[in-house]
Design a protein with these regions (language model features):
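Accessible peptide chain termini
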Residues: 1-3, 324
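Radical SAM [4Fe-4S] cluster-binding motif and immediate context
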Residues: 188-324
Length: 324
């Protein structure tokens, strides 16, 4: 007697990673054919989501499909998202990522029609993380988001994305995921990476990564420490080489290092040395944008090694100007 096996049909879970833009003074969404600065948050979450796919966190029978869209260079059409998530009985989650305070109104305008159609939505980024960290009670805009069923994610997603995806797959998203008291380490975690079509929407085929987060200083005007903490956390030189190699494999050699002050990353020299070695061994024309303070030229070897590593643009922060 011939035996027959029942093969379970595969499920699809669609994960939309959307970086909202913001409105100009006339109420129009600011958008470009190609944008200048790529979203590091989207690259981080895309890398974490790829790791979730590799580890099959939703089970062997579920295919996770990632759709990453940066609204500064891509039109976001909620109707298309609603159609895609509902197609063929698939499930999904829309994650509005890296949302800053001036982007929160736009994030809400994207989210409202999605929630009205029953699509699961989660918002994370500096606005919700900073408000939960600094304010005694949530402001009205975040409360409104919760009222229409939007999940709030405060903190960083390393080691936490599994939980959110599993909850969304089971249609059991929590109202709040608050990881602010427990910020993760950065060593050995999945690297930030974007797919080639996303990178080509940035001028110069540029992508981004962060080599460190947090700061030990307690400047009164700084919001970074209220979100990323007062303990500095770093990627290793091995981590950075992995970022470079994964991107070089898809022809990308142009990077923005998003640390607010790369010169104060205690691993700066090891990172520059590794990038210099990588450039020479792979004949790779690595180009870097970094952010530093006005005193970085006093750090021995910093300027010389920055040049050899491929730094060709620098943002210099003027935190305080003494009129005298």
């Amino acid at each position: 007697v011939a035996s027959s096996a029942v093969v379970a049909s595969r499920e699809v879970f669609r994960l939309f990673l959307i970086k909202p833009s913001h409105y100009d003074d006339d109420g129009y969404v600011i958008q470009w054919v190609q944008s200048e600065i790529p979203s590091n948050t989207m690259a981080v979450l895309n890398g974490l989501a790829l790791d979730c796919i590799e580890r099959k966190v939703l089970g062997d029978n579920v295919d996770i499909e990632i759709i990453a869209q940066d609204e500064t260079n891509t039109r976001i059409r909620p109707k298309n998202i609603i159609r895609a998530i509902g197609e063929g009985g698939s499930k999904g989650l829309v994650a509005l990522v890296g949302v800053q305070s001036n982007q929160f109104p736009r994030a809400m305008d994207i989210a409202r029609p999605l929630r009205a159609a029953g699509v699961q939505v989660c918002i994370g980024g500096f606005h919700v993380s900073g408000c939960m960290s600094m304010l005694p009670e949530l402001p009205a805009d975040i409360r409104e988001a919760q009222d229409i069923g939007i999940s709030i994610f405060a903190g960083e997603a390393e080691g936490r994305l599994d939980e959110v995806l599993k909850d969304a797959y089971n249609s059991e998203l929590k109202p709040v995921y608050n990881y602010m008291p427990d910020l993760p380490g950065m060593e050995g975690v999945p690297t930030p990476v974007l797919a080639t079509p996303n990178i080509k929407r940035n001028i110069g085929n540029r992508t981004s990564f962060d080599s460190g987060r947090g700061c030990p200083f307690q400047c009164s005007f700084c919001t970074i420490i209220n979100v990323q903490g007062r303990k500095s956390r770093y990627r290793t030189a091995d981590d950075i080489e992995r970022v470079l190699r994964e991107n070089l494999d898809q022809g990308v050699t142009n990077f923005f290092i998003t640390d607010d002050n790369f010169a104060r990353n205690r691993n700066w020299e090891a990172i520059f040395d590794r990038i210099i070695k990588f450039r020479e061994e792979n004949n790779a024309d690595i180009k870097l944008i970094i952010q530093v303070d006005t005193l970085c030229h006093n750090i021995p070897n910093f300027i010389e090694k920055a040049g050899r590593a491929g730094v060709n643009r620098v943002f210099i922060g003027l935190e305080n100007i003494n009129p005298d």
